[in-house]
Amino acid sequence: MTVLLDANVLIALVVAEHVHHDAAADWLMASDTGFATCPMTQGSLVRFLVRSGQSAAAARDVVSAVQCTSRHEFWPDALSFAGVEVAGVVGHRQVTDAYLAQLARSHDGQLATLDSGLAHLHGDVAVLIPTTT
């Protein structure tokens, strides 16, 4: 089963200085499944890297490098928000979470996250990566 990485997991994997880099990397290395990204999570990574001082071209190259890994699968954003399960969504920060969870469901996959609230709300597809902090 392929696991869609939410933006925080993707960023933690790419940025060695991230507080959860080791936890995310250890989790991914211990897993033998494939992982997926989508335009929404890739865009979040690019935005984070540019905000951190990298050029847009360098950030795009990071996304390309992620996509070139053998376990990577790209999931296009092919869902309408009209079909997204929104039960439990009470704030604007949960809208993207609901979309990513629905995208994972549509691919018979899972959604990896560092967010315990997301994991609780979407327990049918979410995988909470354990951290020490």
Curated annotation (Swiss-Prot):
Q: Where does Mg(2+) bind?
A: D6, D97
Where does the source fall among the domains of life?
Answer: Bacteria
Note one Pfam family from the annotation: PIN
- Key words of the record: Hydrolase, Magnesium, Metal-binding, Nuclease, Toxin-antitoxin system
Could you tell me which Gene3D superfamilies the record lists for this protein? 5'-nuclease (3.40.50.1010)
**What enzyme category does the UniProt record give?**
hydrolase
A single Gene Ontology biological process assigned to it is:
negative regulation of growth
Q: Please provide, alphabetically and separated by semicolons, the GO molecular function terms listed in this UniProt record.
A: magnesium ion binding; RNA nuclease activity
Ranges for the PINc domain?
3-122
Does the entry feature the keyword Lyase, yes or no? no
Control of this protein's activity: Inhibited by EDTA.
Under which EC number(s) is this enzyme classified?
A: 3.1.-.-
Required co-factors = Mg(2+)
Q: Which InterPro entries match?
A: Mtu_PIN (IPR006226), PIN-like_dom_sf (IPR029060), PIN_dom (IPR002716), VapC_family (IPR022907)
Q: Which family does it belong to?
A: Belongs to the PINc/VapC protein family.
Q: What does this protein do?
A: Toxic component of a type II toxin-antitoxin (TA) system. Its cognate antitoxin is VapB29. Has ribonuclease activity.
Protein name, UniProt field: Ribonuclease VapC29
